[in-house]
């Protein structure tokens, strides 16, 4: 008779169960991705020529996500979307390709070396394309020399933004490890 009693001490109701929460690391990733996207879009409308976080974000995306689609397409899609507003130009393919190459080499080189290398590749390819497209009457050497002030701003902005994003990435990693 005593064996037929139910043990109700282990039963619980729905109010006793903790609500399922979204993984905090996913929330941080969503916030970071949204922040990077907004930074990219807003930077395209700044009045300082070639002072932009675009190249730095292309370099740093492999450190923020393993998703290759995001790594390669986020910077290029932002360029394309803002080019719809700003206007298209004849050298878009060369510019877009530079961002893809920067992301590619950032997976194999240090962040800061990639920043220097990416700007050097940018300087050689984009300004070489300007010369080949016969934009202006300058020789190839003159084209490269005339581009130095603009590309120097690109180098400075890329290094600054890589440093900022490096700190952001490390703080996210530290916070994630600390909250585990």
Predicted regions and their residues:
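Membrane-embedded alpha-helical hairpins and interfacial helices in multi-pass inner-membrane proteins
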Residues: 108-180
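Hydrophobic alpha-helical transmembrane segments
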Residues: 30-34, 72-73, 93, 112-117, ...
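Central hydrophobic cores of alpha-helical transmembrane segments
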Residues: 36-37, 71-82, 114-123
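Hydrophobic transmembrane alpha-helices
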Residues: 12, 23-65, 70, 99-110, 165-170
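Membrane-interfacial, low-structure loops and terminal tails that flank and connect transmembrane helices
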Residues: 11-26, 173-180
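Interfacial aromatic-anchored transmembrane helix boundaries in multi-pass membrane proteins
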Residues: 41-52, 76-107
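Membrane-interface helix-boundary motifs at transmembrane edges
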Residues: 24-26, 65-70, 105-114, 174-176
């Amino acid at each position: 008779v005593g064996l037929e009693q139910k043990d109700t001490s282990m039963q619980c109701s729905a109010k006793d169960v903790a609500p399922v929460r979204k993984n905090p690391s996913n929330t941080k990733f969503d916030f970071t991705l949204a922040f990077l996207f907004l930074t990219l879009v807003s930077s395209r409308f700044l009045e300082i020529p070639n002072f932009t976080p675009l190249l730095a974000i292309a370099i740093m995306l492999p450190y923020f996500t393993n998703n290759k689609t995001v790594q390669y397409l986020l910077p290029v899609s932002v360029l394309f979307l803002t080019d719809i507003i700003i206007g298209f130009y004849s050298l878009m393919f060369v510019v877009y390709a530079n961002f893809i190459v920067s992301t590619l080499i950032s997976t194999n080189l240090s962040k800061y070396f990639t920043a220097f290398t990416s700007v050097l590749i940018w300087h050689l390819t984009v300004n070489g394309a300007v010369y080949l497209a016969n934009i202006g009457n300058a020789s190839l050497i003159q084209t490269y020399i005339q581009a130095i002030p603009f590309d120097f701003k690109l180098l400075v902005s890329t290094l600054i933004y890589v440093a900022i994003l490096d700190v952001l990435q490390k703080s996210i990693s530290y916070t994630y490890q600390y909250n585990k």
